[in-house]
């Protein structure tokens, strides 16, 4: 397994799917969608901060860009796995595009004062910590993403999207509730992953001894 592939597996917690690279062209639809998602990030930020971040129409545009980027994340993975479009380039860039999109949205919302900084720091620290842990244990085998981790990713994206929209009143309260659920899932799945990693490492050491 190459270095870039190990990085992708560590970040995504998905096992390597078939023979990556070599046979698939870099300029395929899956990689184009991944690059498009990365290009969307600065465009999303421009819309988010337009008019000091308080222009309602621009915030709706920012939400549309964010939602589209999240959808492309779903489809590029399906194309890569099911249609022989997996490449080392895509395996390396895809998780970078994911983290860049989510990180930029969280930081942008906090800079505008729409989202408390502690929420952004908590979520990004969890993502960075779990990624580092995955990289540390990758040689011992991949710890697959749990259903909770997948649910966390979905709820997190929905919560961020709701905060991007110019909501008020009961709708804003609903956004806060969804974000609270995302925070709870972020903490629970982070603790669960650390526990599983330590348990697996402990089991390997006992077997070796």
Curated annotation (Swiss-Prot):
It is a multi-pass membrane protein. It catalyses: a CDP-1,2-diacyl-sn-glycerol + sn-glycerol 3-phosphate = a 1,2-diacyl-sn-glycero-3-phospho-(1'-sn-glycero-3'-phosphate) + CMP + H(+). The keyword Transferase applies. One of its GO terms (cellular component) is plasma membrane. It is found in: Cell membrane. GO terms for biological process: glycerophospholipid biosynthetic process; phospholipid biosynthetic process. Pathway: Lipid metabolism; phospholipid metabolism. It comes from the Bacteria. The chain crosses the membrane at residues 32-52, 105-125, 147-167, 171-191. It holds the Pfam family CDP-OH_P_transf. Keywords: Cell membrane, Lipid biosynthesis, Lipid metabolism, Membrane, Phospholipid biosynthesis, Phospholipid metabolism, Transferase, Transmembrane, Transmembrane helix. GO terms for molecular function: CDP-diacylglycerol-glycerol-3-phosphate 3-phosphatidyltransferase activity. Its main location: membrane. Its EC number is 2.7.8.5. Probably catalyzes the synthesis of phosphatidylglycerophosphate by transferring a phosphatidyl group from CDP-diacylglycerol to glycerol 3-phosphate. NCBIfam families: pgsA. Belongs to the CDP-alcohol phosphatidyltransferase class-I family. This is Probable phosphatidylglycerophosphate synthase.
